[in-house]
A protein has these predicted regions:
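Generic recognition of short, well-ordered alpha-helical segments
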Residues: 17-21, 46, 74-78, 158
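Charged, often glycine-rich, active-site loop that binds/positions anionic groups
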Residues: 47-53, 159-163
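A short beta-strand-loop structural module common to alpha/beta enzyme folds
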Residues: 29-45, 150
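A short helix->loop->beta-strand "cap" motif at the edges of active sites that frequently abuts
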Residues: 2, 97-101, 141
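Glycine-rich phosphate/pyrophosphate-binding loop and the adjoining helix
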Residues: 23-27, 129-173
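N-terminal beta1-alpha1 ligand-phosphate binding loop
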Residues: 1-35, 167-168
Length: 173
């Protein structure tokens, strides 16, 4: 199995059973390294050099977060701003994201139909996280899948386990 770094950002994890289920899965498996940004950087002072060095040690990445006010959590946005280095775009500089698989897992309390052109918010999740998608594309990462868990706060334990199993099967493809 590929050595996987999970970059996880949820400012209110204690209120998210869906995210906790996946976090517990990552912690129990040796091929996954979980980095909870809100746990690691409660003061929002990111050690960018250390993070860049860490990225080089992994074969693939999972970026997991909830939609908060129609975007990524602020600490994740800051992490990307601080860690992603424009020098990686130069030919003679190692780009730790180039060619690496990236899986994005997004949870939201909203209904799927609300996140559509004709829905309540008139924007899709892909549009709301487009900054992340563009950043990963510029740095030549391979976005393998974007998993969206709608109404995550209303899922039963059984539905959460089914969502987790579905995501695990995507990782194993």
């Amino acid at each position: 199995m590929k050595k996987t770094l999970v970059v996880f950002a949820h400012p209110y994890l204690e209120h998210s059973h869906s995210n906790v289920e996946l976090v517990n899965f990552y912690v129990r498996h040796q091929h996954f390294t979980l980095r909870d940004l809100y746990e690691e950087y409660p003061d929002f002072h990111i050690a960018a050099f250390r993070e860049r060095k860490r990225l080089k040690n992994y074969d693939r990445f999972i970026i997991q977060f909830p939609i908060i006010w129609f975007g990524m959590p602020p600490l994740l946005r800051l992490w990307i701003d601080e860690v992603f280095d424009r020098s990686w775009l130069k030919d003679d500089v190692e780009n730790p994201l180039e060619g690496k698989e990236v899986y994005i897992v997004v949870t939201t309390g909203g209904k799927e139909r609300s996140f559509s052109k004709t829905g309540t918010y008139q924007y899709t999740i892909d549009e709301l996280i487009s900054g992340l998608i563009v950043s990963l594309n510029i740095f030549k990462a391979k976005i393998m899948d974007i998993t969206i868990v709608y109404e995550a706060n209303k899922l039963s334990k059984k539905e959460i386990i089914l969502q987790k199993q579905k995501f695990i099967s995507i990782l194993n493809q």
